[in-house]
Regions:
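Enzymes that bind and transform nitrogen-containing heteroaromatic metabolites
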Residues: 1-123
Length: 123
């Protein structure tokens, strides 16, 4: 996740928001207040490539559009959750100039609340 996603939780006392997962925060100037959170101060693309070479499950990206845009070349699967209400505006999934990227719908689930979860894979 990016620093902008991580810091609001820290201000509320949540220093390890995903304690069941390996946690990484991309930031050039952050010192982690929690030993379970790793800070990536270098190139996030190279860090993700290194993580992808490690054994284990996938990588889940939580955060804003700038980090997602920088990592788009490394994103193999995109999971979008659509909620049945209109907010008016919000944070974009990808922020900045990105190359057109073709995806194929791999799965759709509709929850009892009416929310839908769409999973897309790279073509």
């Amino acid at each position: 996740m990016g620093r902008g996603t991580y810091e609001p939780g820290v201000r509320e006392g949540v220093t390890s928001p995903y304690s069941h997962l390996g946690q990484y925060v991309v930031s050039g100037g952050l010192t982690s207040p929690d030993p379970a959170v790793n800070v990536i101060s270098g190139d996030p693309v190279e860090a993700v490539r290194a993580l992808k070479r490690e054994p284990g499950g996938g990588i889940w990206l939580a955060g804003g559009g700038r980090l997602a845009a920088s990592l788009l070349p490394e994103i193999d699967e995109l999971v979008l959750k659509i909620y049945p209400f209109v907010l008016g505006k919000g944070i974009g999934v990808f922020d900045g100039d990105i190359a057109p990227t073709h995806l194929a719908l791999a799965d759709t689930r509709v929850l009892g609340s009416g929310a839908a979860i769409h999973t897309y894979a790279r073509k």
